[in-house]
Curated annotation (Swiss-Prot):
EC numbers: 2.1.1.199
Function: Specifically methylates the N4 position of cytidine in position 1402 (C1402) of 16S rRNA.
Keywords annotated in UniProt: Cytoplasm, Methyltransferase, rRNA processing, S-adenosyl-L-methionine, Transferase
Any Pfam family hit: Methyltransf_5
Name by which UniProt lists this protein: Ribosomal RNA small subunit methyltransferase H
Residues noted as binding S-adenosyl-L-methionine in the record, renumbered to the chain: 32-34, 52, 79, 100, 107
Disulfide pairings: none
Similarity comment: family membership: Belongs to the methyltransferase superfamily. RsmH family.
Localization: Cytoplasm
GO cellular component: cytoplasm
């Protein structure tokens, strides 16, 4: 099992601009790396709420956080229901919200959950095994070649979606993650197999996003998060691929009325009109060279920050 190191930890804590007495939400608890650092910075009057779909993650995080403070409450649920999950606890406004969108909670290192292309396991990939009946097995073994191709292209941005989909259908039945990896490899040219990135990464990403409806969930949650912020409250989002980036960028830019247009003489105009929100940083923050060396999970990570005026 990899040692889990939180991605962009110092940067996200810095830009969350934590107030001693504030109320904060970690929407992606995972192994509580970010949550621990938030909790350390709160006084006895501050409070942390943290959300995760995974019961195992909740249990492990509880033990870790209790060593720091008791000023927290862990919620098992999907952050698409952010407002409702907080309302149940009589919370209707907060000072900061954090999203770490990387799959870094315990599921990734447990083969039986089916998320890993390095550890053998069943074709599952459900974040919420209680309420979601759609598994990777269903897609891989029952969906049409065209449907699979569309999923891989749309959600994995996989250039070889067509050849991979064709090979998957020809290789059925496919019963495990590592068997799927071999099928994917057999569909790719040698030049791709020699690249640094794992050849199955994009396919597994596509399946995971589709099964868990991740993009719509993120969009819905961010809109709720904006409504929950107190004045000077901030949202920090750590993204890991261009599909997430596009959603965050669109929502943040539209919320701040931040735009760029071209005049007839090709001079760009940038404006931040009167708005409830402002972009704290105009361009997302990327990991330092040191972090990239020490934490392979940080590759492609970007931090985005917005503040309510």
């Amino acid at each position: 099992m990899d040692k889990h190191i939180p991605v962009l930890l110092d940067e996200s804590i810095k830009y969350l601009n934590i107030k001693l007495n504030g109320i904060y939400v970690d929407c992606t608890l995972g192994r509580a790396g970010h949550a621990s650092e938030i909790l350390k910075r709160l006084s006895q009057n501050g409070f942390l709420y943290a959300i995760d779909q995974d019961k195992t993650a909740i249990g492990q995080a509880k033990e870790k956080l209790e060593k720091i403070s008791n000023n927290f409450f862990l919620i098992q649920g999907n952050f698409s229901n952010l407002s409702a999950l907080l309302a149940i606890n009589h919370i209707f406004s907060v000072d900061g919200i954090l999203y770490d969108l990387g799959v870094s909670s315990p599921q990734l290192d447990i083969g039986s959950r089916g998320f890993s292309y390095r550890i053998d396991g069943p074709l599952d990939m459900r974040m919420d095994i209680t309420n979601n009946n759609l598994t990777a097995d269903t897609i891989i073994n029952q969906y049409s070649e065209t449907q699979i191709e569309d999923i891989l292209f749309k959600y994995g941005e996989e250039s070889f979606a067509k050849s991979i989909a064709k090979k998957i259908v020809l290789s059925r039945p496919i019963n495990s993650t590592l068997q799927l990896v071999e099928v994917i490899k057999s569909a790719l040219p040698q030049k791709v197999l020699k690249q640094k990135k794992h050849p199955a990464k994009k396919t597994f990403q596509a399946l995971r996003i589709f099964i868990n409806n991740e993009l719509i969930v993120l969009e819905n949650s961010l809109k709720q998060a904006l409504d929950l912020l107190n004045s000077k409250g901030r949202i920090c989002v750590i993204t890991f691929h261009s599909l997430e980036e596009k959603i965050v960028k669109n929502i943040f830019n539209s919320s701040t009325n931040y735009f760029q247009e071209q005049l007839f003489n090709n001079l760009p105009i940038k404006a931040n009109l009167n708005s409830q929100f402002k972009l704290v940083i105009k361009k997302p923050i990327k990991p330092s060279l040191l972090e990239l060396e020490n934490n392979h999970r940080s590759h492609s990570a970007k931090l985005w920050v917005i503040e309510k005026n």
